[in-house]
Amino acid sequence: FIKNFYMQVQQLPISKFLKTANSLIVPVYQRDYAWKRLNCDKLWSDIQQLISNKRSSHFLGTIVTINDGYGKYLVIDGQQRLTTITIFLLALSHYLRDKENPTEEEIQLQKVFKGYLIDEESISQETRIKLKPNKSDLEYFEKLFDEKKEIIENNSNIVNNYLFFKEEFKKNEISARKIFEDGLQKLHIVSIDLSRGQDDPQLIFESLNSTGVDLTAGDLIRNYILMDLEPQEQEKKYKKYWVEIERLTSDVAEFIRNYLIFKTRSWVKKDDVYLFFKKFAIDTYDNNKELILEDLLKYATIYGSFIQTQKHRNEKISSCLSRI
């Protein structure tokens, strides 16, 4: 399908990708950072194999972006990998920083790593850190860059994976230069940079998203509704509708399956929810995203009463619902 698009495709080391980008923004509709210690352990094992020359390179996956100009990119696909590599580099930099007697080379390496993580030319503190995760992850992510704050283990994947990498660097005692030059720089990606208004990010996302942590039907539907909107509209509709839909329904995919069954009077299998929803949205609402979200929120409120995420305003009805 590539010939039908205006995309720019290139294979390159992920370190080069990070170096040349000034700003990488994860849109609000993207799910939270989901990589666990197991995923990071596998990545670290791959890097160690590269260091020991058992492999000459390792393909990390595809990263899809929309270039908004001036080195600013919206991350459409690949945010899990990008976030993990950023955490890896930051942990490596802090491992060197915390050494009692760092060598001159190690001090210089810290500055090198900083160039992959920080946009030194940015005059705004908000845009100084190159990668900007979605709002759910942002607080924990920014804390890692705060030299004054102690990083302790908690329920954040971002923090815990940072601590995992840092501990591995201490245990293995491989030189930071070797980790970077013989390991990280051999991690390759395929970068797909889309042209806004010309390429269809949703179609490309669906075609490529087959690796990493599986997306639920709820994730895919959220992306489908919000992805092709302008960033400001994405954030507005996400806050106004989607956050409420998630809060009211607990399991968005299951809610939408029941919503579709009710609206179409047809049985919908769990594996078919996403494709069924897309057809329904086009046939019923001519793909008008505002109307779709309004209707979803209306039924999410009713659904929430049934599953008791929201009490019904009539106490007798609420009491009856709780006994179903």
Model-derived segments and their meaning:
Residues 105-144:
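Extended charged low-complexity segments that act as oligomerization/scaffolding linkers
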Residues 79, 88-89, 103-104, 205-207:
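"Short basic amphipathic alpha-helical interaction patches in structured regions
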Residues 82-98:
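Short active-site loop/helix that positions an aromatic residue
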Residues 130-324:
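Polyanionic (Asp/Glu-rich) segments that form extended negatively charged tracts
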Residues 5-76, 80, 86, 187, ...:
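Short alpha-helix boundary/capping and kink motifs at helix termini
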Residues 95-103, 211-216:
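Short, polar/flexible loop-turn hinges at active-site or ligand-entry regions and domain interfaces
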